[in-house]
A protein has these predicted regions:
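Residues at the beta-strand->loop junction immediately N-terminal to the Walker
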Residues: 1-4
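Conserved beta-strand scaffold positions in the cores of enzyme catalytic domains, especially
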Residues: 28, 93-95, 139-141
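Conserved substrate/cofactor phosphate-moiety recognition/catalytic segment
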Residues: 6-58
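Small-molecule kinase domains that catalyze NTP-dependent phosphoryl transfer to phosphate-bearing small molecules
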Residues: 99-102, 107-155, 162-168
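Hydrophobic pocket-lining residues that define ligand/cofactor binding sites across diverse proteins
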Residues: 19, 60-63, 160
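Helical mechanochemical/support elements of P-loop NTPase systems and associated helical scaffolds
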Residues: 30, 48, 52-55, 81, ...
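Generic alpha-helical structural signal
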Residues: 13, 53-57, 79, 83, ...
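ATP-dependent NMP and nucleoside kinases share a basic, alpha-helical "lid"
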Residues: 25, 37-48, 60-118, 124, ...
Length: 168
């Protein structure tokens, strides 16, 4: 979880590649691929954001029950929704917080979403005019505005592959 532009998709894709190259069955769910398909009927209201995260959790659980390692890369702005989504996985899930300042996220913004939000063209944009609840007890915090992509990926990989962390 983290703001738009914090590096969620970048880190998730690299981690997916690392696990795949080791022969694992893995799938990454990303905000863009679900918003353009399964969740295309949802907007960005409070209720729609809650429903978006609920659906993500359900889809991720289906993949996990089928034996996949599942990586989700979503803003997921509300703590209660993240908690519910993670509950489906019992002890075999990790909330990872990608921390980056709003200034850095805006500079990284390839789609110009922050600019549109600041101009009022996008309403309820997380971090601008809609809240983001920072995780209080994530399994790991990646400071993506202070460390390289490679450092973040290595920290994350080490955290989730510690003995006893992943079930086979």
């Amino acid at each position: 979880t983290g703001l738009s532009g914090s590096g969620k998709t970048t880190i998730a894709r690299a981690l997916e590649r690392q696990f795949f190259d080791q022969g694992n069955t893995i799938y990454m769910l990303d905000g863009d691929n679900l918003r353009s398909g399964l969740n295309s009927n949802l907007g960005f209201s409070f209720e729609d954001r809650k429903e978006n995260v609920r659906r993500i959790g359900e889809v991720a659980a289906l993949f996990a029950r089928a034996g996949f390692i599942v990586i989700t890369a979503f803003i997921s702005p509300f703590a209660e929704d993240r908690k519910k989504a993670l509950a489906a996985f019992k002890d075999n899930s990790y909330e990872i917080y990608l921390s980056a300042s709003i200034d850095v996220c805006e500079k990284r913004d390839p789609k110009g979403l922050y600019k549109k939000a600041r101009l009022g063209e996008i309403k309820d944009f997380t971090g601008i005019d809609s809240p983001y609840e920072i995780p209080t007890k994530p399994a790991l915090i990646l400071n993506t505005d202070k460390e390289t992509k490679e450092v973040s990926i290595n920290k994350l990989y080490k955290e989730i592959t510690l003995p006893g962390k992943m079930s086979s």
